[in-house]
Amino acid sequence: CGMTAEELSRLTDPYFTDGRKHKERPAGLGIPFLGQAVEQSGGTFGIDSVPGKGTEVHFAFPLSHVDTPPFGDIAGLLLQIFIFDGEYEVVVRRTVRTAAGSDSYCIRRSECREALGDVYDGVSVQLLKKFFTSQESGITVTQAVKR
């Protein structure tokens, strides 16, 4: 639960893994891939970790890159992150920015599962997909991971 300063400093190295999460894999490509994709799209990316408490990964994509490279189908990717089984929380914040200011709201994985039931259900997946593909705003994701 949480990472040491050394682990955190090597987190974006695709050839580094602590060996705890996936003992059979010699490399961890998820975070390095995410960081590069966010950077290429002009978004923001950050990681906060406290040993004994947990790790939070924050990233935001500009609306102009929701369905273009480097991701292509960001809505589908976020849906996969949302329904992936395990002990973690995902918070997706939708923000609408106009000349007059901005408004935002959040959807949390835990609240969604409670409200919609099994997110593998077809109706639940369609509701999530609609949320992730709405063209009204940009998408910011915070994923709190318990290790």
Where are these regions (language model features)?
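Glycine-rich ATP-lid/hinge loop adjacent to the conserved G-boxes
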Residues: 16-26
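Conserved glycine-/histidine-rich ATP-lid loop and adjacent helix of the Bergerat-fold HATPase_c
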Residues: 33-43
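HATPase_c (GHKL) ATP-binding subdomain of two-component histidine kinases
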Residues: 58-59
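Short conserved segment of the HATPase_c
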Residues: 3-15
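Glycine-rich GHKL/ HATPase_c ATP-binding element in histidine kinases
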Residues: 53-55
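A short beta-strand-to-loop motif within the catalytic HATPase_c
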Residues: 47-51
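N-terminal assembly/transducer modules of large multi-domain enzymes
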Residues: 63-147
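Gly/Ala-rich beta-loop-alpha elbow adjacent to hydrolase catalytic centers
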Residues: 30
